């Protein structure tokens, strides 16, 4: 068995619970690393039909002394639902998993969300470990303890805050990631660049202009920096009462677009990319953001190979109605993360219907601002 090669470690401390984010290579095939965080005799691995043939066998071979059960779910956001969740519960109950069991999430953000939610609720909470295999999950979804399933009315409507025992990011898993999935993860990196600004924003701009790939030497450090940014925010505001809400930049638009298309047109990161551009245009319409910065955001998304316009086939009135179901609404006010400049974002609940409608019209394909 290979030994893992450590690139970086980010320590997270939330509400007295501490855990590491380990960025490495060969982490999935080093039994010593995996078993460091599994003290129980029982383990349930939750994965999907895409990831299982690639990595499940490697992970299982490192757990020979455990009762190791497996749930293999269908792949895709449209399967992040009650039916999949109860498939996990059924396996835990049928295989007589006790309160000291551990759940391992092996996959992308969808698997992490569902396995985490199952862990937070099975027998009022059991241990779980994140092994994210997509770039989006590595830089965003696996960090911070948000878990959820979707409801037909909207995305992530049923969920909890529940922190893992560890997040092990094995960079080797990105080698088998389809290019479209890799690009989708870049959207969350651009989000962090807009939130942080300064040298980090400039670095992301530069690597995207050069062409960021799975083989780029800058990638491990960029992943670590994204994890550090999110960890720092989540440590200060675990339950999204203030600062953490900034991490929703672009997501009010993105979630509505995903729900509108029944999660079948875009990957989550692609919807976020469109949402980031919408947020930039909205900020410009409110007189907050200079047009050259909006153009920079557009260029970053184009360099990343991501969509940024709303297709003209989308009914904007229906899209606006879906936004009214957004779970980030407070006091009946729809809240948006606004951008004054990279590194200066804030929550705004005073966006008028006219301003929002004008923004949506101007980000439709073929329309000019």
Swiss-Prot record:
The family this protein is said to belong to: Belongs to the sugar phosphate cyclases superfamily. Dehydroquinate synthase family.
Reported function: Catalyzes the conversion of 3-deoxy-D-arabino-heptulosonate 7-phosphate (DAHP) to dehydroquinate (DHQ).
A GO MF label: 3-dehydroquinate synthase activity
Signal peptide: none
Catalytic activity: 7-phospho-2-dehydro-3-deoxy-D-arabino-heptonate = 3-dehydroquinate + phosphate
Key words, A-Z: Amino-acid biosynthesis, Aromatic amino acid biosynthesis, Cobalt, Cytoplasm, Lyase, Metal-binding, NAD, Nucleotide-binding, Zinc
Top-level enzyme category: lyase
One GO BP annotation of this record: chorismate biosynthetic process
Binding sites annotated in the UniProt record for Zn(2+): 188, 251, 268
Cofactor(s) recorded in Swiss-Prot or TrEMBL: Co(2+); Zn(2+); NAD(+)
Enzyme Commission number(s) from the entry: 4.2.3.4
Pathway field: Metabolic intermediate biosynthesis; chorismate biosynthesis; chorismate from D-erythrose 4-phosphate and phosphoenolpyruvate: step 2/7
Name of encoding gene: aroB
One Gene Ontology cellular component annotation held by this UniProt entry: cytoplasm
Superkingdom of this protein's organism: Bacteria
Cofactor binding description: Binds 1 divalent metal cation per subunit. Can use either Co(2+) or Zn(2+).
InterPro entries xrefs: Dehydroquinate_synthase, DHQ_synth_AroB, DHQ_synth_fam, DHQS/DOIS_N, DHQS_C
Subcellular location: Cytoplasm
The name this protein goes by in its record: 3-dehydroquinate synthase
Organism of derivation: Legionella pneumophila (strain Corby)
Binding-site positions, NAD(+): 75-80, 109-113, 133-134, 146, 155, 173-176
């Amino acid at each position: 068995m290979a030994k893992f090669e450590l690139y970086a470690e980010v320590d997270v401390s939330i509400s007295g619970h501490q855990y590491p984010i380990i960025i490495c290579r060969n982490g999935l095939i080093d039994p010593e690393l995996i078993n460091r965080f599994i003290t129980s005799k029982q383990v349930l691995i939750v994965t999907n039909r895409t990831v299982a043939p690639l990595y499940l066998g490697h992970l299982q071979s490192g757990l020979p002394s455990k009762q190791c059960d497996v749930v293999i779910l269908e792949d895709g956001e449209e399967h992040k639902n009650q039916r999949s969740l109860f498939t996990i519960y059924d396996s835990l109950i049928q295989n007589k998993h006790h309160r000291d069991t551990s759940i391992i999430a092996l996959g992308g953000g969808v698997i992490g969300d569902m396995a985490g939610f199952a862990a937070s609720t099975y027998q009022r909470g059991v241990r779980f470990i994140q092994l994210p295999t997509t770039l989006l999950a590595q830089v965003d979804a696996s960090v911070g303890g948000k878990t959820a399933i979707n409801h037909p009315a909207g995305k992530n409507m049923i969920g909890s805050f529940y922190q893992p025992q560890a997040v092990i990011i094995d960079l080797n898993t990105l080698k088998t990631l389809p290019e479209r999935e890799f690009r989708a993860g870049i959207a969350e990196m651009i989000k962090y660049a807009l939130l942080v600004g300064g040298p980090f924003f400039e670095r992301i701009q530069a690597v995207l202009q050069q062409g960021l790939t799975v083989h780029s030497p800058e990638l491990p450090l960029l992943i670590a920096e994204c994890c550090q940014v999110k960890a720092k925010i989540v440590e200060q505001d675990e339950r999204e009462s203030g600062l953490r809400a900034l991490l929703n930049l672009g997501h009010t638009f993105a979630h509505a677009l995903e729900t509108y298309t029944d999660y079948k047109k875009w990957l989550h990161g692609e919807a976020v990319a469109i949402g980031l551009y919408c947020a930039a245009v909205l900020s410009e319409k409110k007189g907050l953001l200079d047009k050259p910065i909006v153009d920079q955001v557009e260029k970053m998304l184009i360099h990343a190979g991501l969509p940024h316009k709303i297709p003209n086939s989308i009914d904007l009135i229906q899209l606006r109605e879906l936004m009214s179901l957004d779970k980030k609404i407070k006091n009946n006010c729809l809240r948006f993360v606004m951008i004054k400049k990279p590194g200066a974002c804030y929550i705004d609940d005073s966006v008028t219907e006219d301003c929002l409608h004008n923004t949506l019209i101007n980000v439709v394909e073929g329309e000019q601002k």
